Amino acid sequence: MYKCALILAAGKGKRMKSDLPKVLHKVCDKEMVNHVIDTMRKSELQDVNVVIGKGAELVREATSKKNISYSLQSEQLGTGHAVKCAEDFLRGKDGVVAIFTGDAPLITEDTVKNLIDFHEKGGYKATIITALIDNPEGYGRIIRNVDGSVKKIVEHKDCTEDELKVKEINSAMYCFDIKSLLESLDKLNNNNVQGEYYLTDVIGILEEEGAKIGAISVPFEEILGVNSRLQLCQVGKVMQKRINEKHMENGSTLIDPDNTYIGADVEIESDTIIYPGNVLQGKTVIKTGCVLYPNSRIEDSVIGKNVTVQSSVILESKVGEDTTVGPFAYIRPESNIGNKVRIGDFVEIKKSTIGNNTKVSHLTYIGDAEVGEGCNFGCGTVVVNYDGKDKHKTVIGNKSFIGCNTNLVSPVTVEDNTYIAAGSTITNKVPEGSLAIARAKQVVKEGWVDKKGLLK
């Protein structure tokens, strides 16, 4: 049977007080709407359509790699109107459509599959996701028939005294028979205080026609939506707890999960230890046996086996096996650090390759460089890669020794097995096996201080 999803993502979200469309605010390093799209894809649905409106182009851009289609709701006239805007997507399809909102990112793959399975097996024309909560104040109530099918949805303000006692609430997430949904959409009206078309009215229309309507209950946290910054924080905490628990179940140790921030798409292999204050983002991969000491940020990077990182930033780069980074190192995008390398304190690497077994222990800048294996950089070395207009490349051969406070003025090549004396400024090629000294010869003028009368 054909199965598809419709994600309602057209609202601006006034309570967010933001120029960014609400569904593009991030939860655990991913836009809320992309959380929902990814869940739909994992649920093996054939097609996903997103209804966009406010900030439509921004939403398109953020979701452009997701292989989805779009429907435009140019004017926000309610949830029923949003679904009507997707009629072209639904028309001609024979099957079911699951409808979710782009601001409720906690829905799970299991729930989507269970919803559709329950809908099919029960022979329902519509199925509602519900939740049971102790304090249902403000939520629409699910009123069931004796046989367990849904009789109606009653908004809180319209509930009778008995209906107010019901603790089962509507989530605004549904599964519909597509043909029945389209027929009911044609019968919707906006005869209400808000002048809007409500998707909940479709349930009433189907019930009046004698259609069978079901409901499946899920944990309340799954249906949590975001309408404010406070709710964004609340949803983020639930999502982060899920993510961190998943990694711990897979064999990683998180010393303090409440203070460890791991993005939704981060991969961590077993036997890695993560201390508090770490922030792992993007498509980062942490291989087995790593130790991440407190307060590092790693984004879109691959960290090899048995790497130790201390209080450092690594962006869009690769770090090889058995390497140590930090404390207070900065590895900038497009850097490739080899195996058994030492990147020490206050070292900055930018768009450079560092060969295996090389040591860059402290207070060094390496930019736009290709560094060989087994090299040693003395404290205070600077690769001078920028001439005020263009960036230039530096090549340093294997087993080169760069003395303290050396300036390598790019473009320049230092060949294999070379030594550069401390304090040198290198502007020309250094041949293999050479010692380069590029500094003024020391001159000592004895008695000069007395002659100048500088002693007091």
Curated annotation (Swiss-Prot):
Residue ranges, annotated region (Pyrophosphorylase): 1-229
Keywords: Acyltransferase, Cell shape, Cell wall biogenesis/degradation, Cytoplasm, Magnesium, Metal-binding, Multifunctional enzyme, Nucleotidyltransferase, Peptidoglycan synthesis, Repeat, Transferase
InterPro entries the UniProt entry points to: Bifunctional_GlmU, GlmU-like, GlmU_C_LbH, Hexapep, Hexapep_transf_CS, NTP_transferase_dom, Nucleotide-diphossugar_trans, Trimer_LpxA-like_sf
Lineage top rank: taxon: Bacteria
Catalytic residue list: 362
Annotated binding of acetyl-CoA, by residue: 385-386, 422, 439
Example of a GO cellular component annotation carried by this entry: membrane
Residues reported in the UniProt entry to bind Mg(2+): 103, 227
Subunit structure: Homotrimer.
Function: Catalyzes the last two sequential reactions in the de novo biosynthetic pathway for UDP-N-acetylglucosamine (UDP-GlcNAc). The C-terminal domain catalyzes the transfer of acetyl group from acetyl coenzyme A to glucosamine-1-phosphate (GlcN-1-P) to produce N-acetylglucosamine-1-phosphate (GlcNAc-1-P), which is converted into UDP-GlcNAc by the transfer of uridine 5-monophosphate (from uridine 5-triphosphate), a reaction catalyzed by the N-terminal domain.
Protein name listed in UniProt: Bifunctional protein GlmU
Gene transcribed to yield this protein: glmU
